[in-house]
Amino acid sequence: MFVLAGFAGTGKSTILPDIMNELGLTVADIAFCAPTGKAAKVMGEKLRAQGFTNAYPSTVHSLIYQPKMQKAEVLEKQLEEAKTQWMALKTGAADPPPANLRMELKEQERKIHILEKDLDRAYTMDDLRFSLNPDSKLITDDKKIIILDEASMVGVEMAEDLASFEIPVLAIGDPGQLPPVGDEPGFLSGTPDFFLTEIHRQAAENPIIRLATMVRKGERGDYGDYGGGVMIIRPKQDEFSLDLARDAQIICGTNKRRWQLTSKIRKAAGFGGLTAPQAGEPLIMCKNSKIHPALVNGTSIFSASDHDDLEEGSARFILDIKDEEGAAKRLFTYQGLFEEHLKREKNWSSASKQAAFKSRITDHSVDFGWAITCHKSQGSQWDEVIVHDESWVFKEAADQWLYTAITRAAERLIIVAPE
């Protein structure tokens, strides 16, 4: 396992082709991946811009996990079959004999190792929502290396799961960003193998990178116009958050602020008083879909139609959406996340506790996407971002929070800073 770390503007992405060439690797040899669908999409766009036309990264989940729960008894059977196959290969009893015995033995040993790890998890966890996939394309496509982007978002367990495939991992990440939610960093907790520290001259001239670097060093910028569409303004100057023509992504720190902003923006858009998503409204996936692989946690989608108001007492409703590629889909959706905006209360649902629990487990989790928290924004990037600075809420992680929020902007940035 090799960790390549670097702050914004140090060239983590631009150095990747040189690493591939130095190792003599082609795109076909590499499993490119990232923690979220949006991060994987951004990684792919950067790779293809560098000439790697066939580079289409996947999420870590789709790369190494199976979408359905495997119960302990199923895993036990699979493990027994894998061990029997290994013994047949080892003793020469396999029929027909393999063309490459050494390679077949190695592949079978990998499968046994993965199944043993997954079975151990099944025995010790009450709610196993996914399992490692012993038939991952890492094995079936004979990948030589895993290249993981946005490694700061990966926790200890996922890092261990990646390592269990016994394929070299190159993890690339920014230690200035927030650690994974509810977990310790899996790759960036210690000293990286290589640390890019020098900011490229072109990047150093970018006001977004300048502000990000200041924040990372514990400094804060003054109110004013920094050029290139980058500003720091007072809350009373904020006429931008409600300017729907700007097509900016709003990032804040708390659900309370997110609910307030969403209410104001929906009212400005003409949707005030309407409880359900209306045609064209931005939405965001809040957990991975079990049906549509492309709809992973953090994916931006849009409402495809005007939906009737949410029915009080119901746990679910049918949501028509369009994904990032414009494809239409109909989703059974947990409506509690939308009802939270009405009550301004986390985990609130008008349905019975039993019905709400069942819908949260089985249905899609979607929320309004006008304003999102910084944690939800990790791994994504937008041309224009408006940051409502609530970094003070995060105490010791205040600098990491604001640094992460700032670096979500690719071209234009407005920071609404407290007085």
PLM segments and residue spans:
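ASCE P-loop NTPase helicase motor core
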Residues: F2-K77, E81-T84, A99-G228
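C-terminal accessory regions
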Residues: I15, D320-E419
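Short, conserved phosphate/pyrophosphate- and ester-handling motifs at nucleotide-, phospho-/glycolipid
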Residues: T36, T254, G379
